[in-house]
C-alpha cells in the first residue's frame, strides 16, 4: 500500500466517524440530504430517488440517484464522501440482479418499478437495532446515525356497503 492509498484510507475512516454512511446498493431507494449554500444562508435539500449505479473508488466513490420530477427523469451523481452531503437514508431495499440500472432510463411507469427486497430490509433493521443497543450500552448514542425505515404496505380500503 503506497502513501496515497494509506492517506485516503485514513481520511475515509475519519469521515465515517463523523458521518456514518449506510450500506446501500443499486436498486435501493435513497433519501440524500444535501447542504445547499445560497448567498450567506445554508439549508438542507432532500433528494429522493432510486440508486441506479455505485462507483467504489476509495475516496473518489460516488453513486447515481434517479428520480422522476414532473414527468422528466432527473439523475444526479453524488460523491460519497463529499462534505455537502449531510446524511444518506435508505428508504427501501430493491431486489435487482444488475450492478448498473441504466435500463431504467428507457422505461416509464410500472415497468420502471423495482421489487422491494423485504428480507434485506428486515436484516438491515435487525443490524440497526443491534448497533443502537451497543451504542446505548457504551453511552455513545448519536443523533446523526443512518436511518433505515421499511416502507410498509397500507391495507386496502374496505368496500362501502350499498344501502
Curated annotation (Swiss-Prot):
Keywords: Ribonucleoprotein, Ribosomal protein
UniProt biased composition (Basic residues): 151-163
SUPFAM superfamilies named among the record's database cross-references: Translation proteins SH3-like domain
Comp. bias intervals (Basic and acidic residues): 131-150
One GO cellular component term: cytosolic large ribosomal subunit
Keyword Hydrolase belongs to the record: no
GO biological process, one term: translation
Record-level Gene Ontology MF annotations: structural constituent of ribosome
Residue segments, region Disordered: 131-163
Function: This protein is located at the 30S-50S ribosomal subunit interface and may play a role in the structure and function of the aminoacyl-tRNA binding site.
Cited HAMAP family: Ribosomal_bL19
Similarity annotation: Belongs to the bacterial ribosomal protein bL19 family.
NCBIfam families in alphabetical order: rplS_bact
Protein name as annotated: Large ribosomal subunit protein bL19
Protein's organism: Rhodospirillum rubrum (strain ATCC 11170 / ATH 1.1.1 / DSM 467 / LMG 4362 / NCIMB 8255 / S1)
Amino acid at each position: 500500500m503506497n502513501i496515497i492509498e494509506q492517506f485516503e484510507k485514513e481520511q475515509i475512516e475519519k469521515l465515517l466517524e463523523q458521518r456514518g454512511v449506510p450500506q446501500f446498493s443499486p436498486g435501493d431507494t435513497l433519501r440524500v440530504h444535501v447542504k445547499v449554500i445560497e448567498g450567506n444562508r445554508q439549508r438542507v435539500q432532500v433528494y429522493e430517488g432510486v440508486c441506479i449505479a455505485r462507483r467504489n473508488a476509495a475516496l473518489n466513490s460516488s453513486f447515481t440517484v434517479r428520480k422522476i420530477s414532473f414527468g422528466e427523469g432527473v439523475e444526479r451523481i453524488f460523491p460519497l464522501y463529499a462534505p455537502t452531503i449531510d446524511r444518506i437514508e435508505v428508504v427501501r431495499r430493491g431486489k435487482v440482479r444488475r450492478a448498473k440500472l441504466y435500463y431504467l432510463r428507457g422505461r416509464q411507469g410500472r415497468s420502471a418499478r423495482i421489487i422491494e427486497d423485504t428480507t434485506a430490509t428486515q436484516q438491515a433493521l435487525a443490524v440497526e437495532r443491534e448497533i443502537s443497543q451497543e451504542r446505548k450500552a457504551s453511552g455513545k448514542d448519536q443523533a446523526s446515525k443512518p436511518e433505515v425505515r421499511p416502507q410498509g404496505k397500507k391495507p386496502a380500503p374496505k368496500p362501502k356497503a350499498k344501502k
